Regions:
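DNA major-groove recognition helix of helix-turn-helix/homeodomain DNA-binding modules
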Residues: 62-80
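Short alpha-helical "recognition helix" segments of helix-turn-helix
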Residues: 38-40
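Recognition helix of helix-turn-helix/homeodomain-like DNA-binding domains
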Residues: 44-60
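Short, charged recognition helix plus adjacent turn
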Residues: 2, 78-105
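N-terminal interaction modules that seed assembly of large macromolecular complexes
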Residues: 33-34, 51
Length: 105
């Protein structure tokens, strides 16, 4: 089952450079209430990779553009009022609709 973001993680995120792609991704996911587990499945990487990006670690070129587009889509849907997700079921459903395939629990 996906976990919520810890206070320690949130403090680290707010201290990190918001201009880094992964940190911007983290801000969007936290605002949208999208769990890292489901974000990782959506981006086809491990949960640990997503957390690494969230903390500002480098993103390989092959994944950078995907992370940027994902961030833009999520931020746009926040503005439109489609996000934040009210619960885990809504978060999962939102991401499944985005990629057109089911995510694992």
């Amino acid at each position: 089952m996906p976990r919520t973001y810890s206070e320690e993680f949130l403090l680290e995120m707010y201290r990190a450079d918001p201009n880094r792609t992964g940190v911007a991704l983290a801000h969007a996911c936290v605002k949208a209430n999208l769990p890292a587990k489901y974000v990782a499945q959506t981006l086809k990487v491990s949960r640990m990779t997503v957390y690494s990006w969230f903390r500002g670690k480098p993103i390989r070129d092959k994944n950078r553009q995907l992370a940027e587009v994902f961030t833009d889509l999520v931020e746009g849907d926040i503005v439109k009022g489609l996000l934040p997700a009210k619960n885990l079921i809504d978060a999962k459903r939102y991401l499944e609709d985005m990629i057109g395939e089911p995510l694992k629990n």
